[in-house]
């Protein structure tokens, strides 16, 4: 387990970030990685299943609303129930909420525009395994690209998420201050990413796979590899499980 995780990346019709994630896990981290067509029904012995970004089924009806009925999703639910890792990025986060693997919903951005930018995120609940590799770091910077990334949940669900420390990423400024101005899409409580109560399923709107290689950074800085550390966190968590 300490040599790497066995990764499966689900490909839905309309996915467009699957190969970006595969580049990180297969080429940079040297982890065994397979692309899995959405009609698969057996996830075998994968440690990590990733639902990548994109526009699954053209975002018809609602983002992720059709993808949740794909045959592979029953296996993803079983994988999660077994305590194994599941990561949903952007459209993958939307699919996880539609499939009820995570609470709440992702709705239209506050200004109704598609947003493509880099944002600062304050790390919350650092005891969670997904954040183990970040050490003393409290603020990271990741790209976002979405039109329906506004996180919404009812008051009771929000209170439970906060009380259970299921919020892992919160939109903030460069100093880690959570403000209305640092919220790009109107998400309640500035929420950018949450996990399930057990902690093995994570959904996030920012794209960690786009901040994992110095060669792809337009301005190398302390935040260049902020996304890579998310994946490295799982290896650390698995090695010491």
UniProtKB/Swiss-Prot annotation:
Domain of life assignment: Bacteria
EC numbers, comma separated: 6.3.5.3, 3.5.1.2
Pathway annotation from the record: Purine metabolism; IMP biosynthesis via de novo pathway; 5-amino-1-(5-phospho-D-ribosyl)imidazole from N(2)-formyl-N(1)-(5-phospho-D-ribosyl)glycinamide: step 1/2
CDD domains with a match to the protein in the record: GATase1_FGAR_AT (cd01740)
Gene3D superfamilies for this protein: 3.40.50.880
One GO biological process term: 'de novo' IMP biosynthetic process
Catalytic machinery residues: 90, 207, 209
InterPro entries linked to this entry: Class_I_gatase-like, PRibForGlyAmidine_synth_PurQ
Nuclease found in the keyword field: no
Record localization: Cytoplasm
Catalytic reaction equation(s): N(2)-formyl-N(1)-(5-phospho-beta-D-ribosyl)glycinamide + L-glutamine + ATP + H2O = 2-formamido-N(1)-(5-O-phospho-beta-D-ribosyl)acetamidine + L-glutamate + ADP + phosphate + H(+); L-glutamine + H2O = L-glutamate + NH4(+)
Keywords, comma-separated and alphabetical: ATP-binding, Cytoplasm, Glutamine amidotransferase, Hydrolase, Ligase, Nucleotide-binding, Purine biosynthesis
Recorded GO MF terms: ATP binding; glutaminase activity; phosphoribosylformylglycinamidine synthase activity
Domain Glutamine amidotransferase type-1: start-end pairs: 6-241
Pfam families, alphabetized: GATase_5 (PF13507)
One Gene Ontology cellular component annotation held by this UniProt entry: cytoplasm
Role played: Part of the phosphoribosylformylglycinamidine synthase complex involved in the purines biosynthetic pathway. Catalyzes the ATP-dependent conversion of formylglycinamide ribonucleotide (FGAR) and glutamine to yield formylglycinamidine ribonucleotide (FGAM) and glutamate. The FGAM synthase complex is composed of three subunits. PurQ produces an ammonia molecule by converting glutamine to glutamate. PurL transfers the ammonia molecule to FGAR to form FGAM in an ATP-dependent manner.
SUBUNIT field: Part of the FGAM synthase complex composed of 1 PurL, 1 PurQ and 2 PurS subunits.
Protein name: Phosphoribosylformylglycinamidine synthase subunit PurQ
Native species: Thermosynechococcus vestitus (strain NIES-2133 / IAM M-273 / BP-1)
């Amino acid at each position: 387990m300490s040599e790497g995780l066995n990764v499966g990346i689900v490909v839905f019709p309309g996915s467009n970030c699957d190969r970006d994630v595969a580049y990180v896990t297969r080429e940079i981290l040297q982890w065994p990685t397979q692309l899995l067509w959405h009609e698969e029904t057996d996830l075998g012995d994968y440690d990590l299943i990733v639902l990548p970004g994109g526009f699954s089924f053209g975002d018809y009806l609602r983002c992720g609303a059709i993808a949740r009925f794909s045959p592979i999703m029953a296996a993803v639910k079983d994988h999660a129930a077994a305590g194994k890792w599941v990561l949903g990025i952007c459209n993958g986060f939307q699919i996880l909420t539609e499939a009820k693997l995570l609470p709440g919903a992702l709705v239209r951005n506050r200004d109704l525009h598609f947003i493509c930018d880099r944002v600062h995120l304050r790390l919350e609940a650092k005891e969670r395994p997904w954040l183990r590799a970040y050490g003393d770091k409290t603020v990271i910077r990741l790209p976002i690209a979405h039109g329906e990334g506004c996180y919404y949940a009812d008051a009771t669900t929000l209170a439970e998420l906060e009380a259970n420390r299921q919020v892992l990423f919160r939109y903030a400024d460069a100093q880690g201050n959570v403000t209305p101005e640092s919220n790009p899409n109107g998400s309640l409580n500035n929420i950018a990413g949450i996990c399930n109560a057990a902690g093995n399923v994570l959904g996030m709107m920012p794209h960690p796979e786009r901040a994992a290689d110095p060669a792809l950074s337009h301005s190398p800085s302390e935040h260049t590899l902020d996304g890579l550390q998310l994946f490295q966190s799982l290896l650390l968590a698995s090695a010491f499980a």
